[in-house]
C-alpha cells in the first residue's frame, strides 16, 4: 500500500455540515474552521483503496492519483471529496434502492424515474451520478487547452466561439448561489446548452429546467474547493478549466448525440 505524507506548518481542518435552510429545502454547507495545530502530518492514501459496501453500484475508479491535479485541486481536497463524500453518496444510494425495482436499473434510468419527493433517493442518486461524471471531466495533463473536433464545431455554432462558451460557463458557475452544479448538456434536439442545478439535482431529472444529457460537470459545493480556495469560487472555476479532459468531453458529446439520433 503506497502512501505519501505532506508536512504543513499549520493545518486547517474544515468540517462540512449539510443543512436544510429555507422553504425550498436548499442544501448549503456550514464551514467550521478550528484553530490550527502545529506540525500536523497528513497521510494521503490511494483512491484504489476506497471501496463501497456491497450493492448495486460501486465507485467509479478515479483515473488519477489524489495529488495528480495539484495545484489546481490539491490532494487533501480530492482525497476528502472522493473517499468521504462520493463514498457516502454511493453507500447511501445502495441502501435507498435495496430490495426495490431500482436495484436492476442503470443510474440514468433511476434519475429519470425517481420520485422527487423522496429526498434520500434524489440526493444520493444525484450525488452518485454527478460525481461519477465530474471525475472523468478532469485529467492531470490535458491533450488540448480547449474543445476539439466535433465538439469545437458545435461550440462555434451554438456559442459563437470556444471563448464565448468559456465565458458563459464561468458566468453561470459564478451566479449559482449555494450548493449545486453547472453543466454543459446536449438537449433533446441535439443542441449544446449550459445550465445549472441546485444541490445534487441534474439535467436527467424530471424537474430539470433544461433537460438533456450532461457531457461536462463542475461541482459547486463548497467541499469541492474550500480547502484550496476558501471563498474564492471564481479561482476554483478558473483552475477547473486548466484540467478539463477535452478528449473525454468530446467522446461524451458524440455519445449524447447518438442518444438523440443526431449522429
Model-derived segments and their meaning:
Residues 1-9:
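Bacterial N-terminal signal peptides that target proteins for export
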Residues 17-20:
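C-terminal motif of bacterial Sec signal peptides marking the signal peptidase cleavage site
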Residues 22-24:
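Bacterial signal peptide processing site
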Residues 42-65:
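Acidic, low-complexity proline/glycine-rich segments
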Residues 73-87, 108-129, 209-215, 219:
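Alpha-helical scaffold segments that form or flank carboxylate-/histidine-based iron centers
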Residues 84, 95, 99-104, 112-196:
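All-alpha RGS (Regulator of G-protein Signaling) helical domain and cognate RGS-like helical scaffolds
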Residues 174, 179-230, 238-244:
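An amphipathic alpha-helical core segment
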Residues 232-236, 240-263:
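Low-complexity, Gly/Ser/Thr/Pro-rich intrinsically disordered linker/tail segments
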Amino acid at each position: 500500500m503506497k502512501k505519501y505524507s505532506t508536512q504543513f506548518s499549520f493545518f486547517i481542518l474544515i468540517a462540512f455540515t449539510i443543512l436544510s435552510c429555507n422553504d425550498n429545502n436548499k442544501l448549503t454547507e456550514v464551514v467550521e474552521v478550528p484553530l490550527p495545530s502545529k506540525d500536523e502530518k497528513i497521510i494521503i492514501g490511494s483512491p484504489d483503496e476506497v471501496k463501497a459496501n456491497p450493492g448495486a453500484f460501486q465507485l467509479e475508479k478515479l483515473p488519477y492519483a489524489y495529488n495528480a491535479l495539484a495545484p489546481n485541486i490539491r490532494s487533501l481536497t480530492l482525497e476528502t471529496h472522493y473517499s468521504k463524500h462520493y463514498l457516502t453518496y454511493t453507500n447511501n444510494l445502495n441502501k435507498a434502492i435495496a430490495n426495490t425495482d431500482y436495484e436492476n436499473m442503470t443510474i440514468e434510468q433511476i434519475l429519470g424515474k425517481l420520485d422527487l419527493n423522496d429526498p434520500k433517493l434524489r440526493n444520493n442518486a444525484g450525488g452518485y451520478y454527478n460525481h461519477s461524471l465530474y471525475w472523468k471531466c478532469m485529467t492531470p495533463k490535458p491533450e488540448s487547452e480547449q474543445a476539439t473536433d466535433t465538439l469545437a464545431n458545435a461550440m462555434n455554432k451554438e456559442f459563437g466561439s470556444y471563448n464565448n462558451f468559456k465565458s458563459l460557463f464561468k458566468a453561470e458557475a459564478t451566479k449559482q448561489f449555494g450548493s449545486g452544479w453547472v453543466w454543459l448538456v446536449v438537449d433533446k434536439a441535439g443542441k449544446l446548452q449550459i445550465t445549472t442545478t441546485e444541490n445534487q439535482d441534474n439535467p436527467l431529472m424530471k424537474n430539470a429546467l433544461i433537460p438533456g444529457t450532461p457531457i461536462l460537470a463542475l461541482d459547486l459545493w463548497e467541499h469541492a474547493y474550500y480547502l484550496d480556495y476558501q471563498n474564492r469560487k471564481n479561482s476554483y472555476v478558473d483552475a477547473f478549466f486548466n484540467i478539463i479532459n477535452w478528449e473525454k468531453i468530446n467522446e461524451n458529446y458524440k455519445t449524447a448525440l447518438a442518444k438523440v439520433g443526431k449522429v
